[in-house]
Amino acid sequence: MKPKHTQVPMSTKVFFGLGMLAMQMFPAALGVFMVVLVQDFGFDPVMWGLIFFLPRVVDAITDPIMGFISDNTRSRWGRRRQYIFVGAILMGITFITMWQLYPENGLTYNFWYFLILSVVFYLGLTIFSVPYVALGYEMSTDFHERTRIMAIAQWIGQWAWVIVPWFWVIIYDDSWFSSPESGTRTLAIYVSLFCTALALVPALFIKGKSSLHDENLAKITFGNIKTTFWTLIKGFVDAAKNTPFVRLCAATFFIFNSFQTIAAFSFFIIVYYLFQGDAGAAGIWPTLHGSVGALLTTFLVIPIVTRMSEKLGKKKTFMISQAISIVGYILFWFLFIPGKPYMFLFALPMFSFGIGGLFTLMMSMTADTCDLDELKNGLPRKEATFGAIYWWMVKFGTALAGLLSGLIMSYVGFDANLGEQPEGAMTGLRIFYTVFPAIGTLIAIYDMKNYDINEERAKEISSILAERNKETN
């Protein structure tokens, strides 16, 4: 039996994409603002690394639990929307609060204040993002429609990376704010209100199917906690046995988190290598690195990757796009040139294929592996559990990347308090900036060599599931 696939209305795709913009803008703004912790609040590299690492460890623990809860929620609103709503509100309130930092409170107080509120913020992000991502996985059963949904979501979400780098310019501009600390406190309020409004859109405007009387769902109660725990563990075991899904997680871990380890170095390389530590002279060049890269991803990478995927298949498109990104990383070594800051812009088109291609394809491919899980293990479907485990890999890796960033800066001898860096410090940062993500990407390409869900197999699985569900009904 050939399964019937319903095309998702463009309005629904856009509503989903607005949630993606919020999900990307909150962390993007956080990354920009965190430079202020080093530059203006005096956080040393190790403290900076811990601020990155510890909240994300907590986040990585809570993600799979949230996935299980969402997958098994019985509600007339469905399994996703109410959590998206609550998570959006919690993120918004906490983001404003965590950035109300004042230098006169002292380094130790500011460190603990920010660390504790970061944990709460990431809890809100978990409550929002896990059911939100699952909502996207279950919007369509069609192999290519899934890619189109994620492509539109990523296209909208990429605007976060176009907009947010300009926050550097705003908070360091004396005509806007008296100090970067003041700029961060104020800008955090506007960013939070905007992102919270976007995050609420999927909860309010994407219709959910009632799960109130779904007997396939596990009962989540404190009285049933033992059964609930073992059902949760079984979901993890099922995911771990799903070899294509494990390959997606591993590839994402190596690509995204090797990139995350060196991402903040772009600011330091531009300011301290191209402009000898003069942030004022660096002007908008750090901003252009992020903003132009995001624009290229939005208007070049995502359309090309989406089209290639329909013609060549998702796996082959993944391999090609990641190979292109390695060329981009290598070009950065040659194109960061003091006195010619514009040269690094020529590396950005190829560099942008890495992350831009990764999430456009991987979120679609994860939905395909959820079908495989239903084929092998039956109902309930585990979109949120799979999404949570996938993003657990991303977030745990990001936590590790944050810690590694601080350790690498310490290892090479980088000191943000110095204008001119010690001999070898900038060379060390530049070597890591090129070599570290290139190695991570090569490992991911090797891992994906044996990924085996192509369009033909995906359609075969969908047909079997459609026939099975018809018989059940």
Residue ranges of predicted features:
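Membrane-embedded alpha-helical bundles of multi-pass transporters/translocases
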Residues: K2-N473
